[in-house]
A protein has these predicted regions:
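Conserved functional hotspots at enzyme active or ligand-binding sites that engage polyanionic ligands
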Residues: 1-114
Length: 114
């Protein structure tokens, strides 16, 4: 399986607890490709949601359906960084354009207070 930064994948997440994302949901890979190509068994992702009310939260990025390959508009919720096992990524849906990926990465900086 080839995983690249900017890929949109369906992932099998553990059961949700509190506000954490859970179950099967789309994610975008934000981990750099040097690590993605390494023997490291994990990958850092940002959870996507179809709940458009999150589009106005600081740093979050609205992603039109044609950008993600998911069939409906989504929001990259940058406050929900998730480290997953590479085997948790089950189905590749698409790949973000570099311009959208840069917005997500900038949003992570906002979430981290950078």
């Amino acid at each position: 399986m080839t995983i690249a930064q900017g890929d949109v994948w369906w992932a099998d997440l553990p059961e949700a607890r509190g506000s954490a994302p859970g179950f099967r949901r789309p994610v975008v890979v934000v981990q750099g490709d040097a690590l993605n190509r390494s023997r490291l068994a994990t990958v850092v992702c940002v959870a996507l949601t179809s709940n458009l009310k999150w589009a106005t939260a600081p740093g979050n990025v609205s992603l039109p359906a044609n950008v993600t390959g998911l069939g409906k508009e989504s929001v990259a919720n940058v406050s929900q960084l998730i480290t997953l096992g590479k085997t948790d990524l089950t189905e590749r849906a698409g790949k973000l354009a570099r311009s959208k990926l840069e917005l997500v990465l900038s949003g992570i900086d906002v979430a981290l207070g950078r």
